[in-house]
């Protein structure tokens, strides 16, 4: 367990454009009943022109405002995304510039829908170093960029949005934007913050979720007799996502509960001491299956699928922020955050809000 961290603030952002299930009947053969009964999704938010970085900035500002720290106090920015606006510069550097967080070093990660879990774990490990005091994590996704809207099984699943958290080293004195100081790891709460993480991957199943076409070598010095570059995966859908739905379902319903069990086993904390599980929002049937396998009531598994759909790595921090602002998740509660996604990747982390 790691005691030296604290979630200071959460934030989220969803675009204004809301697309109800009924709209999809205009472009593919489907209807609201077919979509909602199979996914639990009734609507989703889609960008009407906002870039991935723009949504990330808005979520980040909300998290920073809640944290009560100045952007200049942020030491590290980690962005998780599978839909960056540029190969370079990375999204974290763009967000740093927009926030004025000039003292932060920055990088992006891509672990698909598990990205926020991995970013959180990286952040906690950096907080153990003397150079890092405050970390901003931003998960921001424009999945509409990669969605084939002629594929009725895929296009109804995804939404756009961003979520963010500010995490601080709880063993150090946190300085707020107003200049007030507070010891976030005083003697009365030295045991308040617990942490454990379990992350895994199965690269042999990478074909189950593939996005963006393979780009072969194309420089002018390729010899005429050179072998042709071959993609690792067969992908004939341009830059759009392709997904093997049944294979992903089997993976998710097996590995997400497994990751949760492993993280609880490592921490020594039993399931009945966990207040809520905040899972990646992919499909209501997956969440129901995971709850059943874990033997927990459905209400312990947080779900906001109905009005946001699958927002990839942004889904967990969006749900976390919504629950915090609604007052359902409160200080001192024990949470398990868990996800699975392309790679294939999976993971869970135990934390205290």
Region roles according to the model:
Residues 1-49, 151-250, 254, 258, ...:
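Condensing-enzyme catalytic core mediating Claisen C-C bond formation in acyl metabolism
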Residues 7-9, 50-110, 263-287:
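Conserved beta-ketoacyl condensing-enzyme motif
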Residues 7-9, 35, 63, 77, ...:
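Buried hydrophobic positions in well-ordered alpha/beta secondary-structure cores of metabolic enzymes
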Residues 12-13, 80-85, 111-116, 139-144, ...:
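Acidic, glycine-rich active-site loops and adjacent beta-strand->loop/helix elements
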Residues 34-38, 42-54, 82-135, 291-319:
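Conserved catalytic cysteine-centered active-site region
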Residues 126-162:
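Flexible, glycine-rich active-site loops centered on histidine and acidic residues
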Residues 227-305:
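A contiguous, well-structured pocket-lining segment that forms one wall/lid of small-molecule binding clefts
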Residues 321-338, 350-353:
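Catalytic phosphate/nucleotide-handling subdomain of diverse soluble enzymes
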């Amino acid at each position: 367990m790691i005691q030296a961290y604290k979630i200071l603030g959460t934030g989220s952002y969803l675009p204004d454009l809301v697309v109800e299930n009924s709209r999809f009947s205009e472009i593919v053969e489907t209807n609201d009943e077919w979509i909602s009964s199979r996914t639990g999704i009734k609507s989703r938010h889609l960008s009407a022109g906002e870039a991935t970085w723009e949504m990330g900035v808005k979520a980040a500002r909300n998290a920073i405002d809640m944290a009560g720290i100045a952007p200049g106090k942020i030491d590290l920015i980690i962005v998780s995304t599978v839909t960056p606006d540029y190969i370079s510069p990375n999204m974290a550097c763009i967000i740093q510039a927009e926030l004025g967080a000039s003292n932060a070093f920055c990088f992006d990660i891509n672990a698909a829908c598990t990205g926020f879990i991995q970013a959180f774990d990286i952040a906690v490990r950096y907080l153990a170093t003397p150079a890092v005091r405050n970390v901003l994590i931003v998960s921001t996704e424009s999945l509409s960029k990669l969605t084939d809207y002629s594929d009725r099984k895929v296009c109804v699943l995804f939404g756009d949005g961003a979520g963010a958290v500010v995490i601080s080293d709880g063993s150090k004195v946190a300085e707020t934007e107003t200049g007030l100081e507070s010891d976030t790891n005083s003697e009365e709460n030295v045991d308040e913050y617990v942490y454990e993480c379990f992350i895994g991957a199965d690269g042999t199943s990478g074909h189950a979720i593939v996005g963006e076409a393979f780009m072969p070598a194309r420089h002018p010095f390729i010899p005429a007799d050179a072998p042709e570059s071959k993609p690792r995966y067969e992908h004939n859908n341009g830059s759009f996502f392709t997904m093997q739905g049944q294979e992903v379902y089997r993976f998710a319903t097996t590995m997400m509960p497994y990751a949760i069990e492993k993280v609880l086993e490592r921490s020594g904390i039993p399931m009945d001491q966990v207040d809520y599980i905040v899972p990646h929002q992919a499909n209501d049937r997956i969440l129901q299956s995971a709850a059943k396998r874990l033997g927990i009531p459905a209400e312990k598994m947080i779900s906001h699928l109905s009005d946001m759909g699958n927002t990839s790595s942004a889904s967990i921090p969006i749900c976390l922020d919504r629950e915090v602002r609604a007052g359902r998740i409160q200080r001192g509660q024990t949470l398990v955050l868990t996800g699975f996604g392309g790679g294939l990747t999976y993971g869970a982390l135990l934390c205290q809000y």
